[in-house]
Design a protein with these regions (language model features):
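Helix-loop "lid/cap" segments that line or gate small-molecule binding pockets
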Residues: 28, 48-61, 116, 148-149
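Helix N-cap/coil-helix junction residues
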Residues: 34-36, 58, 122, 153-154
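Active-site neighborhood of HAD-like aspartate-dependent phosphohydrolases
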Residues: 1-42, 174-175
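Conserved phosphate-coupling serine/threonine residues in phosphotransfer and NTP-handling enzymes
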Residues: 13, 106-108
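Metal-dependent phosphoesterase signature
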Residues: 54-93, 98-100
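Asp-based, Mg2+/Mn2+-dependent phosphohydrolase catalytic module
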Residues: 1-4, 89, 93-96, 109-188
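Short beta->alpha linker loops
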Residues: 20, 44-48, 70, 83-87, ...
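Residue-level detector of anion-binding/catalytic polar loops
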Residues: 35, 101, 178
Length: 188
């Protein structure tokens, strides 16, 4: 069956965002009087925000809200640390130029995702962008991939997903689409 849709995850797949996210979270944590070690963040990298906060033992809703807001505000100042997977982005661009459909499906917050895609000059390379708040369940649920496939009007068997994380790969597999694990040499 012909592949008609490419879907890529963002963090760790299309772009190595580890250092940019880590530095932004460090600043946000510091501004609320907390600290974040690189080892602690490494264990949580790729989790949805609420799961990250739960893992870090931060239960106060006001502190969580403040961290989320502060991180969103300072994240763009660390975009210089983003490392684009140029081979994958070039492949996606060629596929789209040839008439294929393309999408980003990420657990990242929509505003942060749009800002980062704009920064790397990739906003126009995707027909659809879905973020964490666009679905009820995070990965490993296939909801985000199933939603993209449905909105793009193709079948799962006509879709190829690029993912890096175990939960993302579980979601890709559960969607019924084809998938490829992406490993960036300097991800984390």
């Amino acid at each position: 069956m012909e592949i008609k849709l490419l879907i890529t995850d963002f963090d760790g797949t299309l772009v190595n965002t580890f250092q940019a996210n880590y530095q932004a979270y460090c600043e946000a944590f510091q501004r609320v009087g907390l600290s974040l070690s690189e080892d602690s963040y490494r264990k949580c990298y790729g989790l949805r925000f609420d799961d990250f906060m739960d893992t870090m033992g931060i239960s106060d809703s006001e502190i969580r809200k403040r961290i989320r807001t502060l991180k969103g505000e300072c994240y763009p100042s660390y975009f210089g640390l983003l490392k684009v997977n140029t081979a994958l982005l070039d492949f996606i661009r060629m596929f789209r130029f040839g008439g294929g459909k393309t999408a980003v499906a990420s657990t990242a917050r929509g505003k942060n995702l749009i800002n980062a895609l704009t920064h790397i000059g990739a906003m126009d390379d995707f027909d659809l962008i879905l973020a964490g708040e666009d679905v009820k369940q995070g990965k490993p649920s296939p909801e985000i991939y199933n939603t993209v496939i449905s909105r793009m009007g193709v079948m799962a068997q006509e879709t190829l997903i690029f993912e890096d994380s175990n939960v993302g790969l579980q979601a890709a597999k559960a969607s019924g689409a084809h998938y490829i694990k992406i490993t960036l040499s300097s991800t984390i």
